[in-house]
């Protein structure tokens, strides 16, 4: 929008400049006045004596049609400029049209190298809001490489501001790019912290998805340990955790994710919602081996409730009261109120734990719904 306005203003002032410089007929200049001839002024009403226009041609009007009757007279005053001027006379002798090169005058004529006037454009313009060009400094919303500051800046190595996109972005929430530091919702590898981070090696957070998820009730996956409603064998930690070896927060997704809830991305650092492998912390982080935050997805996620993944908590789990169909398998040991369906050898369940090696999304959804209803 700023570009459209700037161009429109420029064209408007350029038009004013050309009109004021060349648009007016200068009656005091004989050469410019002879370009059009008398009939031009008669047709357009310039010989009525108003505003001093046309008074110069009253004597020519008395003589007849003026300069157009005599070609020699019309050419006599411009004979010195025959090399520069090209004179075209109509066959009927009624009008005379002259094309003047390298001469000022005539309305609407444009000349090269005009100086002055507002709105002039040229290279190396300095200042003004919305200026476009490389290495522009300051101003919000500036576009260009190596821009510094301002929120929403786009480009590599951008510093600060929330929502910055690019690799090695530092700070602000929602930053996207590898090795992003801080801010919630940052996307990129090696992001640390932030909830909702996605990426491998996510740590913590309930609901982490991935193999060897640790803790939390309702976790899905083999070898999960503990928590009520956990689904899957050997799952450890938080409720509903999904993913192998998920560590920490509920619902963390991704391997080795560390930190904030829902962090996305590898080794993402800081804010919630960061994306990338090795995201740290935060709930809802997605990535294998996610650590920390709730909802992290990925293998080796530890802890958090609602984590989903293989090696969650199934056989050999020890259960609280109210477990639903958790002990699937013979020799299952259950809390009070556990629902039947002991399918599988040595399945020992927390409350609501659902079977060993169950990778079924429907069962995971049921476990999550049971968790929500139980809460």
From Swiss-Prot:
Signal peptide: 1-23
Region (Disordered): 47-375
Pfam family, one: S-antigen
Compositional bias annotation for Gly residues: 105-355
Residue windows of the Sequence repeats: 105-115, 116-126, 127-137, 138-148, 149-159, 160-170, 171-181, 182-192, 193-203, 204-214, 215-225, 226-236, 237-247, 248-258, 259-269, 270-280, 281-291, 292-302, 303-313
Keywords, comma-separated and alphabetical: Malaria, Repeat, Signal
Region of interest (19 X 11 AA approximate tandem repeats of G-G-P-G-S-E-G-P-K-G-T), ranges: 105-313
Compositionally biased tracts (Acidic residues): 60-86
Major localization listed first in the record, in broad terms: other
Tagged with keyword Calcium: no
Record localization: Parasitophorous vacuole
GO cellular component terms given for this protein: symbiont-containing vacuole
Functional summary from the UniProt entry: S antigens are soluble heat-stable proteins present in the sera of some infected individuals.
Protein name: S-antigen protein
Upper classification of the organism: Eukaryota, Sar, Alveolata, Apicomplexa, Aconoidasida
